[in-house]
Amino acid sequence: MNTDKVWFITGSNSGFGRSLTEAVLKKGYKVVATTRHPEEIEDLVKEYPDKVKAVSLDITEASEITSAIDTALQTFGRVDVLINNAGFGTLGAVEEISDEQVRKQFEVNCFGTLNLTKAMLPHFRQRKAGHILNVSSVGGFTAFPGTGIYCATKFAIEGYSEALAKEIAPLEIKLTLVEPGAFRTEFAGDSLATPDEQINDYEETAHKFVKMQEEMSGEQPGDPDKAAQAMIKVVESDNPPMRLVLGEDALKATRQKIETFQKELDEWEDVTLSTSYEDAKTTSLG
């Protein structure tokens, strides 16, 4: 096994990021561990002084992105794997969430991830190598009541990632979307954002789902350490998937969405096909 790869991991101080950083270091890889709170990973720096470089990074700041990548290249000479993990959740009915909260959610989860990816691509293109893992969510494939704004950011990540994967494939650069279900991270804990005011009409939909997530915090079925091993397996694979669904709950929700969508496609096929010009030639969007 080649353990010479250099991993660049965002949000490495907690949740998936912390688990993955620890697992990657234990396997002998080198890591550029980025976080807004580098003091929280000092223990890893002491344990692996030659393998890990802790870097302060707020992915919403362009200058910090540039500086972090420069530091990575100066320290280890290259980056082989980019893990876009940093992010947080905003839960509540779509109508309840303020414009400020919506914009902050997109700034971090979507634009921050996108800008870091774009900044890393010149290095990957130059080397004709690299693997990007965008940590999305099962909520990037199917949405639930109370998750509309959070899921909107993840749907956005999925959209640009699908297109980007096709653009960079000829350049020998890989991209994988990671879609976890409920895992024991800080998602439903201190990092969770909620509306300042609630609307009673959403009590049985959005509020019910959000309350369920909050009550589940600390008891989610997913193990972040096992998720880390799954992500390492993907990076070490010669033929990694475009999407990696993690967790039984995520797999079930994904299959339900596919089944429902397929049923609607079949039921409305006649209407779908009724909108073309009679003399139109058959085309493909793929």
Regions found by a protein language model. Name each.
Residues 13-14, 37:
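Conserved glycine-rich cofactor-binding loop
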Residues 137:
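Residue(s) in the substrate-gating loop at a strand-loop-helix junction
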Residues 170-241:
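SDR active-site lid
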Residues 57-67, 99-100:
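The beta1-alpha1 cofactor-binding region of Rossmann-like NAD(H)/NADP(H)-dependent oxidoreductases
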Residues 93-94, 101-103:
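Substrate-binding pocket helix/loop in short-chain dehydrogenase/reductase
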Residues 117, 153:
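Active-site helix of classical SDR
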Residues 50, 71-84, 90:
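A glycine-rich helix->loop->beta "capping" turn
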